[in-house]
Amino acid sequence: IETAAGKVTAPAYIYMGVRPDTVAIALGLGHTAYGRFAQNIGVNAYDLVPAGWDAAGGLALGGLKGKVTITADKSPLVTTEGSARQHGRGIGQALPIGVLLGTEQENDEHHHEIPGLPSQDFKTGLKSPVAADAQGEFANPESKDQGMYDPNHVQKMEKRRWAMTIDLARCTGCSACVTACYSENNIPTVGAPYQGRALSPSQWDERPGANIIKGREMAWIRLERYYEGNDNTENEFSPDFDTRFVPMMCQHCGNAPCEPVCPVYATYHSPDGLNVQVYNRCVGTRYCSNNCPYKVRYFNWFGYGEPERRQYAWPEPMHWSLNPDVTVRGKGVMEKCTFCVQRIRESEHRARAEGREVNADEFTTACAQACPSRAIVFGDAADENWTVSKLAYDRRAYHVFEELNTYTAVVYLKKVNYPAPASPAKA
């Protein structure tokens, strides 16, 4: 794209929200002098704007003539979203504002009734988490052999159910939660180690996006985007469609499908409702990932500290930014969202040292803390004083794949759709 002020070279991504005779490029993005770790990442559309001012004193952005040229450069554009269509699975659900106002009936096309399992049973799953038999001797409070743990403490923990609500009406898809999770939990980036440099044939597998194409992505939160309201599947332009963003992380199921298939008990259920992963037990069978209906467990394909593959290591001084409360995982093990268990335990230890209970909403996860629209709320769903316990029973609440009887700890709130304003021709 070239104007009299300058030119930029950017990849083309076909999106049905942009007219076919239009090119949209964001202002203010791209890094050209941000250090060696972000060198030549993206472009800034301000490079196309001359230093002129309009009558109001602002930068003149209108009236510029530009030229768009197709180059011969090719590079894969990779996303981790998967399908842009829900195919009737009801992952990202919505309802019209009229339903909340009581002026129309809800057409719940994604509601699934299971014989013998009322749809409201998930509330019981939140209030009374399924205690795993990994803590076998604690399952019976009358047991005389309580091991090394205080039985009163264990029973108190079983009354908790750490849970999360995600309001799809507030989520804008900004990915702040994803970035915060990377920073908080020492998650390595599987990206483009040779960005901006020519590749030899031996380095072809290291080209931008190559490892993501192979399914080797690493992110504890996956931001899914779905299109509704238009039947075209070729991403052709359409003025009438609905976009829904769904942050997808480990659902910390009460009946977790990943737990019974692990041959070494690397994943188990904690008394307070967490789906726990023990890294030094894991041998990398990936059975848990195969059995997870939400596909939120990830395998470490690379050794991020191996001296012979330094392109994947944490380069200096970036290793000083690692969170000391979270261990760095090695190649060959599975990992996933932990509900920021380090923050949970730190809060519990502080409360115990001060001789009190954990106060409602006194801490939260990294993703909830970073969310600018407060779409994510975390807390104890079994304690009515926590905000999450109130939101979990909102009339918009639903669970993804509720019919699987997994009793997930993540509750989504349906997006609220407003009627489209009448066009001048129809007004």
Where are the model-predicted features located?
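Long, contiguous, secondary-structure-rich segments that constitute the structural scaffold
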Residues: I1-A163, A169, A180-S183, A192
